[in-house]
Amino acid sequence: REVYSVNVFAPLRLTQLVLPHFRPGARVVFVTSDASVEAYEGWGGYGSSKAALDQVAAVLAVEQPNLRIYAVDPGDMNTRMHQEAFPGEDISDRPPPEASVPGVREIISGHLPSGRYQARNLPVGADR
């Protein structure tokens, strides 16, 4: 229940509260995960909560066509959370969290249409 409160209900409620104050073209960015589309043993709650968040973003994009609604997957990273999720796996070859920053900046300042994106796969500056 807590994972859904944090990953689905809180972002949805916050968005509902600020939605009336947005101007056309405003952006809403949700942080998702590949666990929303890939099945990882033991990750049912987390993965399904991120899948629900992806759906929130998709429906909001249809309901609010004058806004840009994004679900952004920052990608696999060398973090404590990732290491704890995969104990015994060597994750030293994973990029640091900062590797996602250029893609996230593209979402925030570029001209991409609403949708779900993997931050590290975005061609930075390509849509300008």
Identify the meaning behind each predicted range.
Residues 1, 12, 27-65, 76:
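Catalytic loop of short-chain dehydrogenase/reductase
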